[in-house]
Amino acid sequence: MKLQYLVALLSVQAVPPVTAGYIHQYALVGSVIRQPIDQKTQRENLNKLVSDSPLLSLHRTICEIESVSNREGAVGEVLLKYLRDRGFTVEKQIVPADRGTNSTAERFNIWAYPKGCPRPKIILTSHIDTVPPHIKYSLHAPDGDFDRAKVRIMGRGTVDAKASVAAQIIAALKHLKSNKDIPLGLLFVVSEEVGGSGMVHFSNSELNTNPPFFHTLIFGEPTDLTLVDGHKGNLRVTIEAKGVAAHSGYPWLGRSAISEILPILARMDELGDIPVETGGLPSSEKYGRTTVNIGTIKGGAADNVVPETASASIAVRLAAGTPEEAEEIIRRAVHDVSGGSTNITVNFPDSMPYPPIDLDVDVEGFDISTVNYGTDIPKLEIHDEELEVKVKRYLYGPGTIFVAHGAEEGITVGDLEKAVEGYSKLIDAAVKRGWPREVVVN
């Protein structure tokens, strides 16, 4: 009786669903779940899932290659070959190493377009550099019942922004397969994470014509699959203080640079929280308040020495106004706190600060969001001043910015695959729109 009861029980045992031939943790025989599968088998199943998908395998290939800013050459070469093998004409745009780096390796932007279409009307663009350190690519099955869409891909760049790079390429290939005459271009740039010299290089090149030959730009960054209607502006600030060194036992013989800079930094820290009328930085309904982040503070030589120097670097995310207006507010605040001391110096080292950037969101089928982070978008100067219809700029991509740059950077298979659909919608809208009239490009 006991044996019969056991057989009857097993015959009605509920079994977790199996998706795409894979199952997490358990081996399935008939309708009976037996012992957990070993890690080797699970790893093989996950690797097969990736290998069977052109999107996932491309994403894995480029994420496995370290491409920290100023060391993007290796991943660039892989993408060059990948695109050429699939019929694109591909050009290198050599970009010099950023100032202050020791890198001598070649690195470059990638400019790709279908054969016979050197001036595509629609450009998909993202960046191939990442922040340090490189974190190894890895695959992780979901807890509980297996769901293919919930498989998690971890590692540096899996979100920011190689997810966008892979999804944009696959979306472009799918469109060109159905219609080889679609005027699609791909631009993948270097150094987005450290100042944007890659996009600046493209912007200053002969490819950025006046007026532009393109009518649509689709930028790829982690946006949680939302279409972004704008992002905050950016301004960098450095403040330096000079003191006089002395023995800490006789501090009146010197002057502390740290003591001079501290009240100024306290004032800077609150500029985003107080009204413009009382000396604060502006806010807006769309972007909220301007935020001030004191990122680094340096000063002094030892605890028994009155510090001779002190400095701080600050990032300001502008919610309203112009960088020039923000600079004036900051100078005034520093002057008020320091009493106009000549021992305090304020500098704005970014050669290309920018105000809040408004973007296009006129394509149906997307949730809309606003983001606080910066992008390459303001680094590309678009010469459409004389055009009746301006160039469209869209910002969209898979993954969340909340894990980008962190130790837990990662994305799900489902989000990566949905991004291909999202980019396809944006491409379709751009193809349908086209130029309202012919534009002569010099």
From Swiss-Prot:
Sequence positions that bind Zn(2+) 2: 160
A single GO cellular-component term on record: extracellular region
What is this protein's name? Probable carboxypeptidase PADG_04062
Q: Name one GO molecular function term.
A: metal ion binding
Q: What is its main location?
A: secreted
**Cofactor binding annotation:** Binds 2 Zn(2+) ions per subunit.
Which EC numbers does the record give?
Answer: 3.4.17.-
Keyword annotations from UniProtKB, A to Z: Glycoprotein, Hydrolase, Metal-binding, Protease, Secreted, Signal, Zinc
Signal peptide range in chain numbering: 1-20
Output the Pfam families linked to this UniProt entry.
Answer: M20_dimer, Peptidase_M20
